[in-house]
Structures are given as structure tokens and as C-alpha cells.
């Protein structure tokens, strides 16, 4: 059985919580783009599943470069997909980054400039996907890192007619209970707007939701993302976080992070 955490590669130097990172595993923005090892985990999953060129939905793509969780799949393996980003300037830069990468050819990209939420029909992930993919219901990878409505958008996706083999979702490392920010909390656009911890959902809440729909938690790229695989495709290949322990996902934060972010204790929704 494979422990996927052993395959984490792609760490932003001086901006990850892992103190000792081998040089070949550091994010160099050519081989790796992720922040805390996500690139290596995804690479190993799709190697074992024998998916050489897949299709993704990338919710919260930023500039498709700095700490991107799909760029390596695109540039190295030629993946296709849908990029979703509310910041139009960031999305434009992302398009330029792809256009200037000589490794990318024969790919099919779609770009959507808008929010992801369940508050308006034009922001629902199922409606957005339907605007770009007709008849296609299963994707190889869904990523959601939007610093706001992760729980609600993931629930909307899973309860609809779309599915994914692998899901990467951003979580809130500061919460240990099974809680989420409410569906109508103020969204945060870009890292500069994250001045408190009132966003996304805790790892236990997201794990509970994913398990309900047949997904297993196979990697925690602490303190940013959880990676799940549909149990149909796991079949005992990858070690599962069962039971999920607080030490696996919780991070107390460093001085820089805690100074920038107010700790919000009220308003969380218990799941």
C-alpha cells in the first residue's frame, strides 16, 4: 500500500512548514509549482491510475503559476481543463503564462472569470461546468482552493451529476472541529485579502462530506490542501487517513501568519 505523503514534491522555499526539503523536491516553477508537495502526490496518483493525459476543473486558479496545483500536469503531461478565477487580472496573467510555455501544445483549455459559490446560479460550479462541457460528467481531477466556500461548492459538485476521480480541496488549518464558514461569508480574492481565519472548512468537515460521497482521504499537504480519491479507483492502492487525527492536519501557525490573521471564533457552522 502506497503512502502518498512520501511522494510530496513541489515546496516553495521559505514558504512551507516543512523544515527540511530535499533540493530536487523544491518548487522551481518549471518542474514543480505547488506550495506544500501537492505536485508530487498528484503525479504519483495518476501514474498508478495510468492516466497519462487527463482533464481537470481548477477552481481558484490564480495566475496558473505561483503555487498552482495543476500547472505541472499541464506543462509536463499535456492535461486539458477548465480554469476558474474571480480576479480577471490574475486570469489574464495565467493565460499569458500558458501561452509563453513552449512545452504546451495540443491542449484544450477553457477560462471562466467569476466566483464559485452556491449563492447565485451563475456562480454554481455545476452550471459553470455545463457552459463548457456538454455531455461530459466525469473529470480526472477537481481542485478547489478558493479561500471561502470550499465546503458548499464541493457539496454542490458531489450532489450533482458531475464526478471526479481525484479531488484536491483547500482546508482551514486553524480549526479542529467539524466546522465550515457559512455559505454567505465574505469571499477573499487573493492572499492579500486573507486578514482573518474566517474561510473554508476544517479538515474533519471536508473529510466527512467526502466520505459521504465515497471518497477517501489519501494525502494531507499541510497546512493547505486535502487530496481525496474516489474509493472505486483506490481499491486499497493508497493508504487512507482513517481515523483522521488532529495532529495530521492542524497547524498552530507561525508568527508571520498569526500576526496577519485575526482569529474568528464566532459564526462558524457545525457540520
Residue ranges and their predicted role:
Residues 24-28, 190-193:
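Short glycine/proline- and acidic residue-enriched helix-loop micro-motifs
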Residues 45-46, 98, 129-133, 206, ...:
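Hydrophobic, Leu/Ile/Phe/Ala-enriched alpha-helical segments that form helix-helix packing faces
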Residues 121-136, 156-160:
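Short amphipathic alpha-helix with an adjacent loop that forms part of the alpha/beta core around
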Residues 7-13, 17, 31-34, 174, ...:
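N-terminal, active-site-proximal structural segment of metallo-dependent hydrolase catalytic domains
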Residues 1-27, 271:
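Membrane-proximal basic amphipathic "stem/tether" segments
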Residues 29-128, 141, 173-176, 252-259:
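SAM cofactor-binding core of SAM-dependent methyltransferases
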Residues 51, 103-104, 134-136, 162:
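Helix N-cap/coil-helix junction residues
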Residues 55-58, 72, 79-80, 137-144, ...:
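Conserved acidic-Pro-Pro-aromatic motif
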Amino acid at each position: 500500500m502506497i503512502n502518498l505523503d512520501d511522494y510530496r514534491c513541489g515546496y516553495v522555499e521559505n514558504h512551507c512548514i516543512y523544515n527540511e526539503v530535499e533540493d530536487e523536491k523544491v518548487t522551481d516553477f518549471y518542474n514543480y509549482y505547488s506550495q506544500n508537495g501537492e505536485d508530487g502526490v498528484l503525479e504519483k496518483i495518476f501514474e498508478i491510475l495510468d492516466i497519462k493525459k487527463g482533464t481537470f476543473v481548477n477552481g481558484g486558479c490564480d495566475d496558473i503559476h505561483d503555487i498552482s496545483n495543476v500547472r505541472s500536469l499541464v506543462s509536463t503531461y499535456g492535461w486539458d481543463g477548465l480554469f476558474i478565477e474571480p480576479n480577471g487580472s490574475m486570469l489574464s496573467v495565467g493565460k499569458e503564462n500558458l501561452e509563453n510555455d513552449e512545452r504546451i501544445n495540443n491542449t484544450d483549455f477553457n477560462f471562466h472569470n467569476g466566483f464559485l459559490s452556491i449563492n447565485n446560479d451563475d456562480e454554481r460550479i455545476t452550471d459553470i461546468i455545463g457552459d463548457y462541457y456538454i455531455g461530459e460528467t466525469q473529470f480526472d481531477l477537481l481542485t478547489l482552493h478558493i479561500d471561502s466556500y470550499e465546503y458548499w461548492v464541493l457539496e454542490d459538485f458531489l450532489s450533482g451529476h458531475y464526478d471526479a476521480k481525484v479531488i484536491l480541496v483547500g482546508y482551514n488549518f486553524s480549526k479542529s472541529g467539524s466546522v465550515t464558514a457559512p455559505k454567505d461569508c465574505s469571499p477573499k480574492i487573493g492572499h492579500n485579502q486573507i486578514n482573518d481565519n474566517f474561510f473554508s472548512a476544517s479538515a474533519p468537515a471536508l473529510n466527512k462530506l467526502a466520505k459521504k460521497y465515497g471518497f477517501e482521504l489519501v494525502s494531507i499537504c499541510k497546512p493547505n490542501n486535502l487530496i481525496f480519491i474516489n474509493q472505486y479507483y483506490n481499491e486499497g492502492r493508497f493508504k487512507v487517513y482513517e481515523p483522521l487525527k488532529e495532529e495530521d492536519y492542524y497547524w498552530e501557525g507561525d508568527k508571520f501568519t498569526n500576526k496577519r490573521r485575526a482569529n474568528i471564533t464566532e459564526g462558524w457552522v457545525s457540520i
